Amino acid sequence: MLKSIGLKFALPAALVGGCFFLIVKAGSFSKPDPESPVEPPSKQTASVWNSSDSIFQPYGDAVKGLLTFRGNPTRTFYGTGPFPLQTPRVRWAYPDRGSMCSVSYLGDKGDTWCGMGWTGQPAVFEREGRTLLAFGGFDKKVHLMDASTGRDVKTPLLTGDIIKGSPTVDPDGYPLIYLGSRDNNLRVISFDGEALKTLWSLNAYDVKPVLWDDDWDSAPVILKDYLLTGGENGHFHVVKLNRSYGKDGKVVVRPKLIANVPGWDQELLAVFPKPAVSIENSVAIYENTVYFANSAGLLQGWDLTPLATGKPPKRIYRFWLGDDTDASIVVDRDGFLYVAVEYEIGNQRSQFVGQILKINPRIAGDSGIVWRHHVRTKKPDGVWSTPALTETHLIATTDSGKALGINIKSGKIDWNLNYGNQPLWSSPNVIDNKLLLATCDGLLDAYQLNGSQQPRKIWGLKVGRGCFEATAAVWNGRIYIGNRDGKLYGIW
C-alpha cells in the first residue's frame, strides 16, 4: 500500500500519465474468449495443503468462527447469517470512553492514527460458550473481547506501533492469535492466561535482505502446524509452530523459521522504478500452491510440497501485473485466480494489464488472462479492497467509489453501484445473498443480490464519524467493524 496508511516510504512519481475507464473483454490481446470453454487448472489427487472443497467454507471444523481475513485460506468465506433484513442499530462502541489512538512515525514525522484501518477485519469465534472478538487497533494494542458486550475479556497486549492488519485465530483450537504490527514484529499470542501474552515473535529483519519495509499487514495462514505469511520485508515465510500444551495445561509453541523466500527477482527489479516489493496481501492457498503478489505487482505461485522433504517452496508461477497489489488473491473451486490491482505508478504494463483480472495460473504469461477490466478514472485509482466471490459473480470495490458485479464466466460487468468518487477500501461481504458495503463517509449499506440484475438496497446505516477502511466481520448476523474515528462497533 503506497498511501499514508501503508508503506513508510513513498514510491516515485508515475512513469506514464493518462487515465480512463475502459472495459477490455476477453478475446482482445490474443486471450481466450470467455464465452468459449477455458480449460480449468488440473486438480491434484494426492494429499494437499488446502483442498478445493474449502472454497466458500469455514476454516476447518475445530473452531467455529471467522478466523482470518476473508475467512479461510482461499479468502472466500465471509461469515454467517441470518443477515439482518431490517436496519440494525449500534449495540456498543469500543472503547466506551475515549478512542483507540496513538502516534506513529513516518521517518521523523509523527502523526496521530485513530481506530482501525486497512485491512483491520476482526476475527470472531466461539469458545467456551461465548462469542469472542480478536483485533488489533491504532492504539498499538491487541484486544480480545466479548462480542456481545464489547468488553475486554483479557488485558490487551501493547505492541510498539500501530496494527493495520487482520488477526488469525488458531483454527485447530489452540488458544493462540497470530498478528503483526508496524513495530517490525509478527507475534504468536496466547490467550489462556489473565492477559494476552507474546509467546514468540519474528522480526522483519530476522531475514536478509529486507526489501522494502518492515511492517506485517498479512493475516497468516495456519495449516499442518505451519504458519505461512508474507511480510513487508519482501519475503514469504514458513514457520513450523510445534504447538503443544505444557504440564500446567498452558499452550506452548516452539516455532522455527524453516524457510523464507524473496518475493522478488532480478527481472522485476530491472523494470520497476524502486525496490518496492513488500507483501501486504494475505496469502491464499489452493491445494499445494500458495499465491500472493507484492507492491511491485509480481503475482506468484509457490509449490509447498517440497516442505515435506525439508526443502523450501518452489516458485511455479510468475505474472507481472505492473503496479502495487495489496488486495489478497481470491481462488475459486477450479483454481482460477481473481486479482485486484491498484493504479499508482501508471506504467505501460499496468495500463495494458488492467486492475481487475481473472487468470488461469496453469497457462504462462498473458495467455493465461481469461478476462480483465481497466477501472481507472484518475491516479491513484484501482482496487485496494479484496473482492468477494460468489457462485456467479466477483464483487469488487474501487478507489473511485464503484462497486462492480462482474460475471465470473463471461467477464461482463452486470451491475455497478456508484458512490461518487469516495474511496471504497473496506472489502465487500456477501452473506445469505446479501451484499454489505462500508464506505468512507461512515455508511453501512446492505443490498439484496439478484444475479445479473442491479442489487436492491434494503437498508443503510450511518455509523460513527470517520471512514471505514477496515473490513467488517459478520457472524450469526451480527456485524463488527472498526472506523477511523477511533471506535470498533458492534451492530445488530
Residue spans for each PLM region:
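Extracytoplasmic/lumenal domain signature
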Residues: 32-61, 69, 76-119, 123-217, ...
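Intrinsically disordered, low-complexity segments enriched in Ser/Pro/Gly/Ala and basic residues
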Residues: 3, 27-29, 409
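Hydrophobic single-pass membrane-insertion segments
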Residues: 21-32
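Polar/charged alpha-helical tracts
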Residues: 3-4, 21, 197, 305
